[in-house]
Amino acid sequence: LASALTFGAVVATPAQAATKVGCIYVGPPGDLGWTYRHDIGRQAVEALDGFTTTALENVPEGPEAVEAITQLAETGHDLIFTTSFGFMDATNEVAGNYPDVKFEHATGYIRAHENVSTYSGRFYEGRVVQGYIAANVTKSNKIGYIASFPIPEVIRGINAFMLEAKKHNPDIEVEIVWVFTWFDPAKEAAAAQALIDNGADVIAAHTDSPAPMQI
């Protein structure tokens, strides 16, 4: 009887700990762009059973990023998303010290450790659509492009935009203004104004704030 009771018993196990997911943002979720969409995803994960999330926003690219990523790794986060290209070196540096933590880096190309992965989107497809629209609505045949940094992701977008525009309107001129920032509303607005002053009547932007649209 004792054996039967033992065999039929259900052994209680401790509840599984929640998976902790961290996000490092280069700007604020209120940018209505890149960081905003990442944070929508974070909120969706937070709503799932068995997950908790943390977001650190307005983290500069550089030594501060190392500190922020380390903070998440030290506080028990199992998966960390570093959501800006400029976090690439910091991500790989910290990942080497925390082999049990998984790291996902946005739009990068260096995966120095087995626990580092990269992700991106086919953003150039949207740029093709923008180029088509620009070619068909411009009156001045001058269009502008506000670009953040000269990295592969951004250059792919410029090429897609420009090639599609010229395909439908060979007389179009494309002027590019580099702002060397992802999120700086003042710089983005100034770039848009400069393009307008030079005759552009259609402007695309690969930056994070809506400032160019508010000119």
Residue ranges, per PLM feature:
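Structural motif
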Residues: 53-73, 180-195
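Flexible loop/hinge segments that line or gate small-molecule binding clefts
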Residues: 96-120
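Ligand/cofactor pocket segment of small-molecule handling proteins
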Residues: 164-215
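Periplasmic-binding protein-like
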Residues: 76-84, 104-106, 198-209
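C-terminal segment of classical bacterial N-terminal signal peptides
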Residues: 4-14
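An alpha-beta-alpha
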Residues: 42, 127-176
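Boundary of Sec targeting at the N-terminus
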Residues: 16-18
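Extracytoplasmic "Venus flytrap"
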Residues: 22-48, 54-65, 85, 150-156
